[in-house]
Amino acid sequence: MACAAARSPADQDRFICIYPAYLNNKKTIAEGRRIPISKAVENPTATEIQDVCSAVGLNVFLEKNKMYSREWNRDVQYRGRVRVQLKQEDGSLCLVQFPSRKSVMLYAAEMIPKLKTRTQKTGGADQSLQQGEGSKKGKGKKKK
């Protein structure tokens, strides 16, 4: 206990961890989601979380090869962990609007859908669906 008290809140070891599973609306609470499903995001990535947190002025860094222990899929898309500094050297908050780890997670989940990468992906998907609808043709005879 004394060892933990001796370390500064500004040490990178003391930054909070945010895994993409914490914000994923496809996950249940048992699978690792930590915010309400109504506020969660569909399949967030660690880089998106990092982009949102660094844009607001938080001190963040990305650990690409870290995996969430409850994540069964070992695909590269699901890897990553973001470390965020909440408290400064003297113990005061870095940003007053983020007093807790939950406030950071809720903010990230709110801002990720507004990222340019998210808005461009949805626009491109609509166009490809419309193009695909016009070219549907019958397959022909069934083979016996």
UniProtKB/Swiss-Prot annotation:
GO cellular component: cytosol; nuclear body; nucleolus; signal recognition particle; signal recognition particle, endoplasmic reticulum targeting
Highest taxon in the source lineage: Eukaryota
Keyword terms: Cytoplasm, Nucleus, Ribonucleoprotein, RNA-binding, Signal recognition particle
GO biological process: cotranslational protein targeting to membrane; SRP-dependent cotranslational protein targeting to membrane, signal sequence recognition
Region (Disordered): 117-144
Localisation per UniProt entry: Cytoplasm; Nucleus, Nucleolus; Nucleus, Nucleoplasm
One Pfam entry name: SRP19
Record bears the keyword Ubl conjugation: no
Listed InterPro entries: Signal_recog_particle_SRP19, SRP19-like_sf
Compositionally biased spans, kind Polar residues: 120-133
GO molecular function term, any single one: RNA binding
Subunit structure: Component of a signal recognition particle complex that consists of a 7SL RNA molecule of 300 nucleotides and 6 protein subunits: SRP72, SRP68, SRP54, SRP19, SRP14 and SRP9. Interacts with IPO5, IPO7, IPO8, KPNB1 and TNPO1. Interactions with IPO8 and TNPO1 may be involved in SRP19 import into the nucleus.
Similarity-based family: Belongs to the SRP19 family.
Described purpose of this protein according to its UniProt entry: Component of the signal recognition particle (SRP) complex, a ribonucleoprotein complex that mediates the cotranslational targeting of secretory and membrane proteins to the endoplasmic reticulum (ER). Binds directly to 7SL RNA. Mediates binding of SRP54 to the SRP complex.
Protein name as annotated: Signal recognition particle 19 kDa protein
Organism: Homo sapiens (Human)
Phylogenetic classification of the source organism: Eukaryota, Metazoa, Chordata, Craniata, Vertebrata
